[in-house]
Amino acid sequence: TKKDDKKTAQKYHGKLAVIIDDCGYDLAPVRKLVNLNAPFSYAILPYKDFSSDALHVIKGGGQTAMLHLPMEPMDRTAMSEGKITILTDMTAEQVQQLTRKAVDSLPGIEGVNNHQGSKATSNEATMKAVLKVLKQQGLFFVDSSTYSKSIGDQVARSMGVPTARNNIFLDNSSDEDDIIAKIWQAVEMADRNGSAIAICHARPHTAAAWSKVIDEVNASGIQLVPVSSLLK
């Protein structure tokens, strides 16, 4: 369409890092995304049927693998991961043990971001316990920013853990056209601010949307980068 031609002809500048959350449930979208050969960063939920397979596919494709660490949301009834979720009423030792176990289950990861976690990422004591493990293991932390008042990235910075914060979610809608519109919104954000971080999910519609626009995004002048290159 004419609209898309105009977008591609416009030269954007800046760096865009894209994190693919929820890897471990379904392998097909992960394979499809990895096959695009874009430097995406993949956040894997621990202990899922395909967590190890996803790690293998991601590392095999030369991409960045991360742990998608389940953390307590404001509404506990909405918690998707039950017993493996970091809770704010756990002791520091319990938090560290759960974090370490999840990290160890995915050898070769480079960093961590939070799954859910609006309550946990706004709790300083909980974040300090998680980040202590990450610091010991040389891992970075990306605050998924599921909650505007989360302080995960601030606490990480204060502890000397390399960190960054998500700026935009791309696939709150499962409609392909909506996802594509959000991808261009993220490109524009990266152009405006010099860089941006976007999160989407390992789902069929998301993989299909990226397949449609990846060439245009690459041609637009925006540079897709691993999230590790935008850490502060």
Residue ranges and their predicted role:
Residues 1-2:
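Juxtamembrane proline-rich low-complexity "stalk" or linker regions positioned immediately after a signal peptide
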Residues 20-22, 44-46, 67-71, 114-116, ...:
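A cross-domain feature marking catalytic cores of carbohydrate-active enzymes
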Residues 47-51, 88-97:
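Glycine-rich anion/phosphate-binding loops
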Residues 224-232:
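Short, flexible loop segments at boundaries between secondary-structure elements
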